[in-house]
């Protein structure tokens, strides 16, 4: 068999083999990559949130609360964010963030493959070994994707250090890049990024750190912000200023290296000093009680989620100047009441020299080199008492100041049953060396006391000019509240619910149901005038009565404040002088009249009458209700007086003027047509709507005017006479309960209705028998009203010409017409009810209606 011969066999080309292998590997790798990507996409892409449309971008943003005159009063948020359009973000700020976070942002497709892979490997190793550091590897697009995931899935799930989370983040980043422009991604990122200091987004950060708008930032300020996203806490300019400065230098260096800024700009920004500020707590600093009541109202109507996330603009009816005046009046008046209670002793007694030295050293560290500033409060230590006991040396930090006896004349032992001026002290003997005190620095001797009754030149001490002086203070124990209403605009202009919101958020204006005392008497007399046809000149009998309650086996014997009796008096005199017995007798007559001699039914009818005026709380089912024994809320008492001011028309009182959503669309609007702070558009729209809300006539205009005139007399010459210092026509009523547990003064001018209350929260003991409404509450009312109405004339309380009212001069004793004389007074009457010449007016003068006491 012959050999096989191969003919024309080509030579092997060995050099092609590597290329074939490479091709095979590339094909296999590509196939694996596609399959792998498909598998990853199938496994992890399910449930990824939709890419947000930029024009429908709705991140959580803060709700802002403003006063009626545009002052920021509070903010509420989960994330403090303000969305700013991309066009308003400075180019340099955009460049700073790109330089710091993602220098190749405009060149990549959304994902840093190497960084993400490295982060995934290290995350896996960390999970297996428990060692190592979890590492990030995110572009700006990936960070934006993470924010979208957090919004859709919640913080915990979307920030978990897992491979799954990183993959989902990368997949979403690719979607973002495919569906949005780079500028749109930056818009989302710069409004979402957390920058510490309660700041989400660059606008919020600009405000929080620098108190500026983002468009006004300097390059140095921009670089500092751009350095924060990686670790806001670590690079905080507050807690780590040196790290923040180094990080800022890094950002500026990156910007220079990338050609974003010149060498000169780099040099200037590197040298620039950047001032940062703490976040202003406007809620607590300005009007916490008012703002908190606003928050509750918004939550009740729209829900907490809307408040915290939807960026409402809430415009309250609060007048910022009136609110400040109210807060100052409450503080000043409450401190005065508390001092009249007496001195409760030092904050602490340091008996040993070692304890005293330790306190002084600590105080030095706190004070540093600060000077003693008049008007400020300090905690000091008594280090020496003068031999004559007329002054004490107080050490504040390392400085010694003088406390003369004049600065603590009020510091007697606590005793509310002794009249204050008679127990003023003339020395500093209540103090001991080692006492830790609250003192207030004063400018000169005149500032040592606000109390004219306590002034004494001899107790001011002889000191060199300019020597630091202080006066003794103490944290007040009683509470106070004030509420002020513009009756015509129906605006709640000012409100203070207590002495210290931080110590107790309980808002006494809305939440404290307190006995109004004699403040309720105008309601009783309004009922008698309205229902029984009584007049200002109706003769009442001020004589002793006893009320027996066989059902409860009680005997009640009301008495006047002065415990005396005046016999026959006119109704106006009875109210002006706040006489108790005529008010009780009027209440009894009214109950018998309305109940057709059935007093139980009659008291229920009076209760209905009071509720019709605006009270929500029930009257006690007995005659003590005449003297204000049934509790009322301060806001409701003020609203009822506002109804009287409006000639008997009841209308709602608003403390929210309007609410707008994040786009400026109106959510609700109660703007008054004559609101000087509102836009013409708001005034016209809301004013037109109010034409169809005329209010409810719950008291005839004639009766309302007569009650106003009665209360005008209280201010002109009765228990509220001190209110004449206002220098403007006012009408109102004092209120004092048994044992002075509550002290009130509620009064109004034509344009402003204000109610002030003073008392203890839990009634541990009374304010003291001399702390009447006229002494404890009226000064707060007056201090507020003098500032609130400064420069504003108030018209007299003249009746409208259309009302059928007439004036007559009446004899004070008989109620008959009188020509002249000191025993007569001019009164208003509804036409047809004025007395005749020859016959005394009849009504409550029949003393036989009541059980007489021998």
Model-derived regions: residue spans:
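Soluble, non-transmembrane domains of envelope/secretory-pathway proteins that act on or interact
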Residues: 1, 10, 280, 351-365, ...
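Peptidoglycan glycan-strand catalytic modules in the bacterial/periplasmic cell-wall system
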Residues: 3-7, 12, 29, 60-62, ...
């Amino acid at each position: 068999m012959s050999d096989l011969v191969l003919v024309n066999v080509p030579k092997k080309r060995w050099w092609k083999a590597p290329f074939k292998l490479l091709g095979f590997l590339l094909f296999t790798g590509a196939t694996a990559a596609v399959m792998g990507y498909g598998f990853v996409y199938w496994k992890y892409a399910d449930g990824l949130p939709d890419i947000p449309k930029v024009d429908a971008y709705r991140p959580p943003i803060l709700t802002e609360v403003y006063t009626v005159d545009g002052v920021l009063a509070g903010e509420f948020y989960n994330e403090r964010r303000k969305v700013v359009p991309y066009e308003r973000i400075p180019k340099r700020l955009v460049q700073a963030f790109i330089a710091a976070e993602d220098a190749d942002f405009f060149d990549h497709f959304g994902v840093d493959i190497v960084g993400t892979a490295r982060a995934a490997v290290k995350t896996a190793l960390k999970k297996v070994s428990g060692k190592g550091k979890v590492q990030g590897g995110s572009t700006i697009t990936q960070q934006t994707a993470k924010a979208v995931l957090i919004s859709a899935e919640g913080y915990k799930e979307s920030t978990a250090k897992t491979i799954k989370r990183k993959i989902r983040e990368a997949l979403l980043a690719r979607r973002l890049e495919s569906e949005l422009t780079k500028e749109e991604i930056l818009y989302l990122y710069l409004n979402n990024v957390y920058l510490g200091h309660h700041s989400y987004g660059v606008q919020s950060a600009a405000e929080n750190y620098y108190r500026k708008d983002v468009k006004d930032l300097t390059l140095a300020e921009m670089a500092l912000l751009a350095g924060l996203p990686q670790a806001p806490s670590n690079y905080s300019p507050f807690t780590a200023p040196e790290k923040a400065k180094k990080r800022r230098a890094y950002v500026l260096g990156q910007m220079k290296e990338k050609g974003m800024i010149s060498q000169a700009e780099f040099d200037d920004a590197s040298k620039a000093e950047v001032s940062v500020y703490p976040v202003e707590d406007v809620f607590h600093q300005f009007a916490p009680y008012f703002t908190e009541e606003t928050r509750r109202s918004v939550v009740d109507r729209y829900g907490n989620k809307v408040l915290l996330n939807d960026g409402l603009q809430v415009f309250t009816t609060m007048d910022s100047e009136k609110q400040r005046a109210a807060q100052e009046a409450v503080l000043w008046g409450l401190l005065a009441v508390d001092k009249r209670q007496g001195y409760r002793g030092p904050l602490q007694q340091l008996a040993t020299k070692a304890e005293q030295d330790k306190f002084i050293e600590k105080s030095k560290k706190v004070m540093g080199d600060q000077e003693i500033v008049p008007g400020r409060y300090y905690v000091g230590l008594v280090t020496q008492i003068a031999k004559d006991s007329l002054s004490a040396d107080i050490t504040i930090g390392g400085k010694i100041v003088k406390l003369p006896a004049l600065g603590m004349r009020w510091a007697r032992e606590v005793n509310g049953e002794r009249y204050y001026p008679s127990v003023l002290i003339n020395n500093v003997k209540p103090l001991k060396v080692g006492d830790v005190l609250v003192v207030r620095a004063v400018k000169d001797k005149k500032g040592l006391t606000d109390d004219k009754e306590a002034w004494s030149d001899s107790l001011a001490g002889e000191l060199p000019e300019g020597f630091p002086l202080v006066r003794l203070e103490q944290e007040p124990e009683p509470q106070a509240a004030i509420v002020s209403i513009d009756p015509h605009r129906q605006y709640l202009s000012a409100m203070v619910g207590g002495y210290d919101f931080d110590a107790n958020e309980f808002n006494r204006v809305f939440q404290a149901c307190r006995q109004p005392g004699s403040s309720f008497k105008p309601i009783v007399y309004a009922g008698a005038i309205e229902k029984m046809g009584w007049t200002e000149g109706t003769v009442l009998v001020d004589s002793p009565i006893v009320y027996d309650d066989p059902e409860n086996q009680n005997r009640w014997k009301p008495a006047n404040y002065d415990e005396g009796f005046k016999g026959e008096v006119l109704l106006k005199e009875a109210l002006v002088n706040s006489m108790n017995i005529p008010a009780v007798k009027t209440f009894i007559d009214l109950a018998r009249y309305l109940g057709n001699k059935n007093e139980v039914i009659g008291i229920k009818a009076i209760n209905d009458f009071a509720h019709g005026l605006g009270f929500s709380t029930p009257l006690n089912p007995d005659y003590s209700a005449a003297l204000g024994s049934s509790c009322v809320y301060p806001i409701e008492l003020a609203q009822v007086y506002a109804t009287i001011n409006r000639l008997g028309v009841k209308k709602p009182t608003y403390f929210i003027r309007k609410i707008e959503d994040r786009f400026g669309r109106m959510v609700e609007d109660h703007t008054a047509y004559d609101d000087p702070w509102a836009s013409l558009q708001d005034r016209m729209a809301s004013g037109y709507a109010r034409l169809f809300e005329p209010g409810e006539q719950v008291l005839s205009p004639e009766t309302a005017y007569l009650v106003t005139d009665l209360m005008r007399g209280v201010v002109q010459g009765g228990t509220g006479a001190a209110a004449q210092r206002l220098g403007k026509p006012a009408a109102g009523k004092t209120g004092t309960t048994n044992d002075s547990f509550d002290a009130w003064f509620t009064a109004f001018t034509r344009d402003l209705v204000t109610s002030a209350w003073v008392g203890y929260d839990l009634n541990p003991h009374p304010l003291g028998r001399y702390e009447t409404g006229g002494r404890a509450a009226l000064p707060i009312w007056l201090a507020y009203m003098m500032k609130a109405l400064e420069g504003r004339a108030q018209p007299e309380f003249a009746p409208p010409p259309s009302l059928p009212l007439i004036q007559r001069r009446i004899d004070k004793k008989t109620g008959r017409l009188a020509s002249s004389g000191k025993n007569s007074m001019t009164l208003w009457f509804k036409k047809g009810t004025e007395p005749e010449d020859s016959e005394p007016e009849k009504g409550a003068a029949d003393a036989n209606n009541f059980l007489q006491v021998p």
